């Protein structure tokens, strides 16, 4: 009856199951747990298809929601699945349960395709439900809590630090023109097109085209300093002897 199960523990009766625990009876199952088994919400990577937190198979099915709303109409079948046109004006969750109007479950959303403004989805049917039983225009329903506003998938207009603006990843923000590793990635250096220190095309210290150490054709680098060794000041020159010509 510990407050929190240990890492790799069973989590039985604990307030929160351990990492890798079974989560049996715990308030929240462990990482890799059963996602269920009496727990309120399973851990990372667990089961619980249709449970409170969604996820994999074998968890507690809470049954149909209190309310369902129209999400789309049947368009055509594709092998054992059905394809529907979204008429809700919102975007459904992946793996969200789909129902008839009487809250009988039809299946679960498998794929969503199209643009934010005009899209559709495919449904993997529940056992015993046949794709051949649907007619064109048959209505399908969903829990309203499984819908997202379409604005989340539209580009942000004006101000803020949205993508492509002056913010992170933008033209002049963090991740500007001279970025690390990328064509215009974040920071300096790291092999970028105009990278700085590490292997950049016009970079600085380490092995760059005009770099310093190791490969400076006429500069100050160690090893391979062509100019200094030729003039007698380098490592391989004989600086103590002078040849006298009459």
UniProtKB/Swiss-Prot annotation:
Subcellular location as annotated: Nucleus, Nucleolus
Origin superkingdom: Eukaryota
Transmembrane segments: none
Biased composition (Gly residues): 181-221
Keyword Methyltransferase found: no
GO cellular component, one term: box H/ACA snoRNP complex
InterPro entries: Gar1/Naf1_Cbf5-bd_sf, H/ACA_rnp_Gar1/Naf1, Transl_B-barrel_sf
Comp. bias regions, Basic and acidic residues: 168-180
Residue runs in coiled coils: none
This protein's record includes keyword Ribonucleoprotein: yes
Pfam families: Gar1
Function: Required for ribosome biogenesis. Part of a complex which catalyzes pseudouridylation of rRNA. This involves the isomerization of uridine such that the ribose is subsequently attached to C5, instead of the normal N1. Pseudouridine ('psi') residues may serve to stabilize the conformation of rRNAs.
The name this protein goes by in its record: Probable H/ACA ribonucleoprotein complex subunit 1-like protein
Source taxonomy: Eukaryota, Metazoa, Ecdysozoa, Nematoda, Chromadorea
């Amino acid at each position: 009856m510990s407050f929190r199960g240990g890492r790799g523990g069973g989590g039985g009766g604990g307030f929160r199951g351990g990492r890798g625990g079974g989560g049996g009876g715990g308030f929240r199952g462990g990482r890799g747990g059963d996602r269920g088994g009496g727990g309120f919400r399973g851990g990372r990577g667990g089961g619980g298809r249709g449970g409170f937190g969604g996820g994999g198979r074998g968890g507690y099915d809470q049954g149909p929601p209190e309310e369902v709303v129209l999400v789309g109409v049947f368009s055509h079948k594709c092998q054992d699945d059905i394809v529907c046109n979204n008429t809700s004006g919102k975007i459904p969750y992946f793996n969200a349960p789909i129902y008839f109007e009487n809250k009988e479950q039809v299946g679960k959303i498998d794929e969503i395709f199209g643009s934010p403004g005009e899209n559709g989805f495919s449904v993997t049917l529940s056992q015993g439900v046949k794709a051949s039983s649907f007619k064109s225009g048959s209505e399908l329903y969903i829990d309203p809590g499984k819908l997202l506003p379409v604005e989340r998938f539209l580009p942000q207009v004006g101000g803020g630090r949205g993508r492509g603006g002056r913010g992170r990843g933008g033209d002049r923000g963090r991740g500007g023109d001279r970025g690390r590793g990328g064509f215009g990635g974040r920071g300096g250096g790291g092999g970028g097109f105009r990278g700085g220190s590490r292997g950049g095309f016009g970079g600085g210290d380490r092995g760059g085209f005009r770099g310093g150490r190791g490969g400076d054709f006429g500069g100050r680098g160690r090893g391979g300093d062509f100019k200094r060794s030729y003039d007698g000041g380098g490592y391989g020159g004989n600086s103590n002897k002078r040849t006298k010509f009459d």
